[in-house]
């Protein structure tokens, strides 16, 4: 995600007239990368931008370099943390390191699409990074005591406190409003309303046979290959794999079943104009979809995005898809 700032966000949003040096941090450093990092310390007088992943602050190498960089610009530096829920845990090593190093920057900002993931208590470390006085609490525990109802429980001979519910959330919301800015999707994007359409795809006879056998007996057989499941959850997974047309036998053999899903997808795409994002659950499905699209619409028509694609290549694929004048129309992930 952090490479997105280097490849897309800064090039799009930083004005062309601003002279700058922009360097992407990488944990494994070659001589070329070291020389690139050294340009952040020259005296050209331009804007210096260091882009690091949050995980780097869990390492001494990343923390030391960030410390060195910020010490050069005391009183002038800004630190921004994207996806700031990555520092929501006040006891995590990287959170503690970032809170400490944040004191070297005169300006601090956070960005997130979901400041509260599980609990309002997630807000404490994020807000403390901005300014310890924003919430009016000097410690996480006083903050928790103010906004959470706690209960003591004994586990294995030791006593722990558990959150049972939350309180004074209106008060907390009022405090947040004073130093936060919320932008809704409809405020910044001109998008049509979502339209949901369900398309029913019939299973082939081969799929139906495997599906109902697995459903009844938690076992399915294909050309002598057995697929079984030991739990209800595994059975549900196997049933889903069968409906998708591909499953793994117990000996890890990949079994392909005739299915109508790909034909239904291609029919749907013939009715669609503009760019299309296609999500699939399994890598094998992605592979089949990409092959079919490239065969029908050309090699440059489709890019894929998943963990099996190199991180640098993934960013290139995003850029290709976002290029309104480019040939890439389908994004499969």
Question: Where would I find each of the regions flagged by the language model?
Answer:
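Walker B catalytic acidic pair
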Residues: 82-83
């Amino acid at each position: 995600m952090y490479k997105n700032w280097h490849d897309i966000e800064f090039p799009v949003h930083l004005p062309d007239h601003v002279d700058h040096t922009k360097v992407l941090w990488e944990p494994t450093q070659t001589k070329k990368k070291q020389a690139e990092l050294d340009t952040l310390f020259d005296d050209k007088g331009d804007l210096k931008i260091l882009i690091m992943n949050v995980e780097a602050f869990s390492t001494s190498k990343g923390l030391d370099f960030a410390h060195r960089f910020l010490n050069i610009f005391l009183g002038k530096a800004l630190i921004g943390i994207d996806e700031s829920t990555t520092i929501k845990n006040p006891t995590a090593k990287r959170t503690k390191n970032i809170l400490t190093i944040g004191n070297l920057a005169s300006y601090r900002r956070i960005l997130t699409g979901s400041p509260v993931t599980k609990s309002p208590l997630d807000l404490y470390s994020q807000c403390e990074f901005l300014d310890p006085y924003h919430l009016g609490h000097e410690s996480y525990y006083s903050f928790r005591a103010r906004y959470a109802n706690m209960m003591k429980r004994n586990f294995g001979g030791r006593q722990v406190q558990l959150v049972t519910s939350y309180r004074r959330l209106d008060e907390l919301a009022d405090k947040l409003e004073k130093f936060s800015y919320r932008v809704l999707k409809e405020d910044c994007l001109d998008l049509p309303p979502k339209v949901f359409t369900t398309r029913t795809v019939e299973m082939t006879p081969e799929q139906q046979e495997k599906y109902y056998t697995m459903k009844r007996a938690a076992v399915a057989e294909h050309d002598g290959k057995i697929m079984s499941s030991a739990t209800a959850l595994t059975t549900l997974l196997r049933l889903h794999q069968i409906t998708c047309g591909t499953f793994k036998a117990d000996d890890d053999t990949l079994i392909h079943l005739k299915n109508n899903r790909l034909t239904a997808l291609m029919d749907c795409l013939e009715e669609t104009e503009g760019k299309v994002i296609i999500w699939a659950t399994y890598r094998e499905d992605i592979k089949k979809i990409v092959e079919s699209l490239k065969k029908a619409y050309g090699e440059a028509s489709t890019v894929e995005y998943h963990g099996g694609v190199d991180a640098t290549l993934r960013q290139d694929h995003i850029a290709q898809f976002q290029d309104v004048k480019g040939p890439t129309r389908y994004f499969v992930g």
